[in-house]
């Protein structure tokens, strides 16, 4: 299969590309810079120059592919609404190019989009009002237009070497503050998945998933945030403390809105229906390997 991949040079995308190539697929990766293009060529992929802000270009690339994996997202924490709108336009453009073809379009979302405070499953509709909800709904709706569209919801912590997501930010904050913190009793849970396992799931969804389905890239149902704070405190040799919810923004900055989220997530249906078998280390074990603190 000739697969167009957006976000192909990102943390997850740079694992998805070799996963696809290793399974016999051809990859065309989206690159907006010379460095990105060089990285894709080195990985054995073709290059399509463009960006998420060019929906017409994305449509051309999708039209020339047998399938699409959409990983790119504008991670602008100052303007989530604008980032979500850009994502929606990209999905609509690529979906229109694939309409009536029954070709696969795999769209990325997050497990935190599901209702909070109970075990989330693949059948849960997204909670209203999040910046990714319109994108996920648009992707699932493409099934009615003859696109084999599906959604992969990534755990909040996709971890592994080179991670630059939430956990490295928690480590940075702990270094700056001289203490490793959690909110309240720290019992709220974040699911996790190793980068290599997430990449394998994207391939399986591309190859197998029926139209209009959602899948969960979550190896662990939920790691208590207090456990993360404790392992960070141990490695940095700083005290582990509780921060009241009303001080979350003051202590964690932009992460304050996420640090208290309780997002336990099941991937039972994903494993059963797609044969996904995560093999990477868990989040705490990955932290204990030490590379996050180099």
What is the predicted role of each segment?
Residues 133, 159-169, 176-177, 204-215, ...:
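Glycine/proline-rich active-site loop of Rossmann-fold NAD(P)-dependent oxidoreductases
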Residues 26-28, 74, 86-130, 150:
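Conserved Rossmann-fold NAD(P)-dependent oxidoreductase catalytic core, especially the SDR/UDP-sugar
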Residues 199-255:
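Mid/C-terminal beta-alpha module of Rossmann-like enzyme folds, strongest
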Residues 29-92:
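NAD(P)H-binding glycine-rich loop region in Rossmannoid oxidoreductase-like domains
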Residues 137-161, 166:
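Conserved beta-loop-beta element that borders a ligand/cofactor-binding pocket
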Residues 172-193:
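A conserved pocket-lining segment of Rossmann-fold NAD(P)-dependent short-chain dehydrogenase/reductase
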Residues 3-23:
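N-terminal Rossmann NAD(P)H-binding glycine-rich loop of SDR-like oxidoreductase domains
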